[in-house]
């Protein structure tokens, strides 16, 4: 959940061991997104940077406490994906 993620990230700011675990999880998630983005033809640094932007966008969305309905998120999903991936999917 977003609240759990935020709480763990706050904890990680104060505990190096927790920070190491959070970083490892973040790295795995970014690696998974990189593989996904590579399926759309991006390679190397471009795939990694697009994956990071996508991940940081989602983490930031939760960190800022954004609130919108699922309907609104689904409506905007194609726009987000075009901005993050670079073309319509």
Regions found by a protein language model. Name each.
Residues 12-13:
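Acidic, metal/ion-handling microdomains and their immediate structural contexts
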Residues 1-6, 16-41, 49-52:
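Amphipathic alpha-helical packing segments from all-alpha helical-bundle domains
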Residues 19, 39-89:
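Hydrophobic/aromatic-rich alpha-helical bundle segments in the mid-to-C-terminal region
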């Amino acid at each position: 959940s977003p609240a759990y993620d935020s709480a763990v990230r706050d904890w990680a700011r104060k505990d190096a061991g927790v920070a190491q675990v959070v970083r490892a999880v973040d790295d795995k998630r970014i690696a998974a997104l990189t593989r996904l983005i590579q399926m759309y033809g991006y390679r190397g640094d471009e795939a990694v940077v697009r994956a990071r932007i996508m991940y940081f966008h989602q983490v930031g969305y939760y960190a800022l406490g954004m609130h919108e309905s699922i309907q609104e998120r689904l409506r905007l999903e194609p726009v987000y994906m075009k901005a993050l991936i670079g073309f319509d999917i």
